[in-house]
């Protein structure tokens, strides 16, 4: 007596769902990672802007500006934060670099820069 043919459609359907579910999970994690990266860029930009604002005044110091930027960046969730402030003759520039939390280990390094003219006292 010949063996009857078995219907294997259920197996291929479950394989399709496994592949589809994996792709959906990867997409979801990618969207979350993108949001974390954008948040990290916002935090780094805010830290750089605050540092420039603190250092550009007539009596502003780069050390105080560096502390302010470090505090903002670390409280915003960035790790391994480095802040470099360059106070030139006419402008001040702040570079903030840090690492955002990573789910997929991509887009974790963040670097933002802000600059502004120095405030000077002038005689009318």
Can you say where each PLM-predicted feature lies in the sequence?
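Short, conserved structural patches
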Residues: 60-124
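Alpha-helical assembly-interface signal, strongest on the long, hydrophobic N-terminal helix that forms
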Residues: 1-66
């Amino acid at each position: 007596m010949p063996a009857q043919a078995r219907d294997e459609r259920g197996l291929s359907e479950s394989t399709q769902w496994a592949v589809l579910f994996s792709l959906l999970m990867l997409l979801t994690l990618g969207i979350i990672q993108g949001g974390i990266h954008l948040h990290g860029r916002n935090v780094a930009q805010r830290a750089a802007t605050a540092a420039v604002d603190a250092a550009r005044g007539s009596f502003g110091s780069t050390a105080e500006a560096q502390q302010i930027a470090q505090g903002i960046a670390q409280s915003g969730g960035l790790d391994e934060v480095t802040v470099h402030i360059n106070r030139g003759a006419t402008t001040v520039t702040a570079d903030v670099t840090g690492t955002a939390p990573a789910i997929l280990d991509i887009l974790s390094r963040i670097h933002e820069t802000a600059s502004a003219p120095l405030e000077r006292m002038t005689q009318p």
